[in-house]
Swiss-Prot record:
Subunit structure, as described in the record: Monomer.
Enzyme Commission number(s) of this protein: 6.1.1.19
UniProt motif 'HIGH' region: location: 122-132
GO MF annotations, alphabetized: arginine-tRNA ligase activity; ATP binding
GO cellular component terms, semicolon-separated: cytoplasm
UniProtKB keywords: Aminoacyl-tRNA synthetase, ATP-binding, Cytoplasm, Ligase, Nucleotide-binding, Protein biosynthesis
Gene behind the chain: argS
Alphabetical list of Pfam families matching this protein: Arg_tRNA_synt_N (PF03485), DALR_1 (PF05746), tRNA-synt_1d (PF00750)
Protein name, as recorded: Arginine--tRNA ligase
Places the protein is found: Cytoplasm
Lineage: Bacteria, Pseudomonadati, Pseudomonadota, Gammaproteobacteria, Pasteurellales
Species of the source: Haemophilus influenzae (strain PittEE)
Cystine bridges: none
Enzyme class: ligase
Family statement: Belongs to the class-I aminoacyl-tRNA synthetase family.
Length: 577
């Protein structure tokens, strides 16, 4: 049930009948103030201008041809030509009842697509740090949402699992006569990496051996491939622990690292040469793009193969786009990475399209995000200025949540208390990020994110638990409740019903734009509207049984919507708090 979409289609039909072009847009939006209705159509004036008509006169023509009697109880022309739409309470009751009985709360799957979502993407032989948090949780929320909308989602964890560093690591492991790579902890690997780099920089014989191992690895040498596989496996086991703690849906089967595309790179570069897109420049192969200019105003050169024959990230990203279209048969590919990679992605995809590897119908979308900052406004670091490990951040979240819950004199069992601590601790970190517009930087603040007030995980989780407590106080049979009639008479009931039916609008926006903060804002508004409804409209102490059951139905759909919405964000709920 997408009210905005339904109204847009019907008003556009009326606009076309009234003389507007088929390309017109009704521009239907939720109204900001009750006196302007529940929705407004703002596209009348632009269409009237094209036709050379008075906007208010054209608006009346649209109303004369508009079939909304079942949905709207009142339509009015306002100002220079806006159409205000007041929804019909009877229609609202019908749709609320339908949403309650539908497994997806009334959201229907439409236009199923195959969507590749590239997110998280940590490096092998290194531990995940806070810089991986945003891609991991934003990408996962969008993946969950698109699946909920009925799409076929392919998760692609584009891990950094190829390059010269593996030659160094294999050589150093051999030097240390360590045949137990599979038993090493990841922090050991990080130490090995530092030592390997030191040897590589200081010992030419070691460096030569490392370079030879890279060549052997790329050539398929069994020993080198086995050691490389161990390093990858150890890394991904540790990463999986982080994913599980974060309640992120990525698994080992979703790994599509750089190595996957490596066999494609020579033929792609050769093809770019044949097409005349890539030209030799000082021994390297370069694609010059007129669409991007360098400081001198000349076409910018993008290297696809280095002088020594090595390939670059751009070449890999071209191959990835080609693979996702040709092999995975995707309709869309979404990449969640730092804003600083925007130009790089644009250039790689421009070359991909120029080479004809994907058609215009294949959507390549860079869902960029800003940085996580400390309270000083600088990139989030440890007190000593080091990189914050993701596991350490999650440990601290649990520690702080433990203190918070222990301070609240709760009547919970130890198991219940631990579940609340885990849900609030991890949920707070995730929600604080997801509730911010992904394209902006945001300040990481423990006090704000763990607060039970404002747009935070604890507030949302408590709002859900509070509604659950209403049902714990009654013995109403769920079947009987669903069968009970719903009536909407009070303004608070009406406001809540409309907000509940706007769930799909928020969910569809997340799926289209990759913006989980829209869903967070919706859920926060819903929780606030329910709180106002609860204060002004007695439920268990309603004036009669019919009103009680009717309001319980609104409470039930609110509970289901909050739970489903938080689930799409990857935020756990608890039954008691």
């Amino acid at each position: 049930m997408n009210i905005q979409s339904i109204l847009s289609d019907k008003i556009k039909q009326a606009m076309v009948i009234a003389g507007a072009d088929q390309s017109c847009d009704a521009l239907v939006r939720q109204s900001g103030k009750p006196q302007f209705g529940d929705y407004q159509a703002n596209g009348i004036m632009a269409a009237a201008k094209k036709l050379g008509l008075n906007p208010r006169e054209f608006a009346q023509k649209v109303l004369d041809n508009l079939q909304l009697s079942d949905i709207a109880e009142k339509l009015e022309i306002a100002g220079p030509g806006f159409i205000n739409i007041f929804l019909n309470p009877t229609w609202l009751t019908t749709e609320i009842s339908a949403a309650l009985s539908h497994k997806n709360l009334g959201i229907q799957a439409t236009n199923k697509q195959t969507v590749v979502i590239d997110y998280s993407s940590p490096n092998v032989a290194k531990e995940m740090h806070v810089g991986h948090l945003r891609s991991t949780i934003i990408g996962d929320a969008v993946a969950r949402t698109l699946e909920f909308l009925g799409h076929n989602v392919i998760r692609a964890n584009h891990v950094g699992d190829w390059g010269t560093q593996f030659g160094m690591l294999i050589a150093y492991l051999e030097k240390m006569q360590n045949e137990h790579a599979s038993e090493m902890e990841l922090q050991d690997l990080e130490a090995f990496y530092r030592e390997a780099k030191k040897h590589y920089d200081e010992d030419e014989i070691f460096a030569e051996k490392a370079r030879n191992y890279v060549v052997k690895l790329q050539g398929g040498d069994e020993y080198c491939r086995a050691m490389w596989k161990r390093l990858v496996d150890i890394t991904m086991q540790q990463n999986q622990h982080n994913y599980d703690r974060l309640n992120v849906t990525l698994t080992e089967k979703d790994v599509m690292g750089e190595s996957l595309y490596n066999p494609m790179l020579p033929s792609i570069v050769e093809d770019l040469k044949k097409q005349g897109l890539a030209v030799e420049d000082d021994g390297a192969l370069v694609v010059y793009l007129d669409e991007f200019k360098n400081k001198e105003g000349d076409p910018m050169g993008v290297i696809v193969q280095k002088k020594d024959g090595g390939f670059l990230y751009t070449t890999t990203d071209i191959a990835a786009a080609k693979y996702r279209y040709e092999t995975l048969k995707a309709n869309r590919a979404l990449v969640f990475s730092d804003t600083r990679q925007s130009q790089h992605m644009q250039q790689a995809w421009l070359i991909t399209r120029k080479a004809g590897y994907v058609p215009d119908s294949f959507s390549l979308e860079h869902k960029n995000f800003g940085m996580m900052l400390g309270k000083d406004g600088k990139p989030f670091k440890t007190r000593t200025g080091g990189t914050v490990k993701l596991a350490d951040l999650l440990d601290e979240a649990i520690e702080r949540a433990t203190v918070l819950i222990n301070e609240k004199n709760t009547n919970l069992s130890n198991d219940e208390k631990q579940a609340v601590i885990e849900a609030i601790g991890i949920g707070s970190v995730k929600y604080a990020d997801l509730s911010k517009n992904r394209t902006t930087d945001y300040v990481f603040d423990w006090d704000n994110m763990l607060s039970f007030e404002g747009n935070t995980a604890p507030y949302m989780q408590y709002a859900y638990t509070r509604i659950r407590s209403i049902f714990n106080k009654t013995e109403i049979n769920s079947t009987a409740l669903l069968a009970a009639p719903l009536t909407i008479k009070d303004d608070k009931e009406r406001t809540l019903a409309i907000k509940l039916l706007q769930f799909e609008e928020a969910v569809q926006t997340v799926g289209k734009e990759g913006t989980p903060h829209v869903l967070c804002a919706y859920l926060y508004e819903l929780a606030g509207i329910f709180s106002s409804f609860y204060e002004h409209c007695p439920i268990l102490n309603a004036e009669d049984e019919a009103v009680k059951l009717s309001r319980l139905k609104l409470a039930l759909l609110t509970e289901k919507t909050l739970k489903q919405g938080l689930e799409l964000l990857g935020i756990k709920t608890v039954e008691k708090m």
